[in-house]
């Protein structure tokens, strides 16, 4: 919940200012929710990659397998070097790493994303609180205004 000092500041604002504040806070909350969803999606993908690396490390060299080219297209292949993997570091760049380094990279990225998620979640909760508080103050002011004009 927003602090009492910010509520006091909101009560000093006019109706138009409160509407603008609420709209801005709602917009920021929506953007933060989108970012949280993107982080969640990236974390799920990295979890899948880490699981694939773990599965791959258990397979013997020379093992025949299906290699994914896309999400729905697989081609037959043979595991040539079971101790080396290519890691996508972004924007089309890949680095060859050992299996253990690849697993470690995935785990570090997952931890970073979870940390970012937690921080963004706190910011989104604060923004939502500000938006809710502005909405309540706005409703009270509108109710006051309608009561004053009808009496």
From Swiss-Prot:
Name the GO cellular-component terms: cytoplasm; nucleus; plastid; prefoldin complex
Gene Ontology terms, MF aspect:
unfolded protein binding
The protein's name is: Prefoldin subunit 5
List where in the cell it is found. Cytoplasm; Nucleus
Q: Which residues form a coiled coil?
A: 15-35
Query: Could you tell me which species this protein originates from?
Result: Arabidopsis thaliana (Mouse-ear cress)
Gene symbol here is PFD5
Gene Ontology terms: biological process: cellular response to gibberellin stimulus; cold acclimation; cortical microtubule organization; mRNA processing; protein folding; protein localization involved in auxin polar transport; response to cold; response to salt stress
Q: What is its main location?
A: cytoplasm
Q: Pfam families per the record?
A: Prefoldin (PF02996)
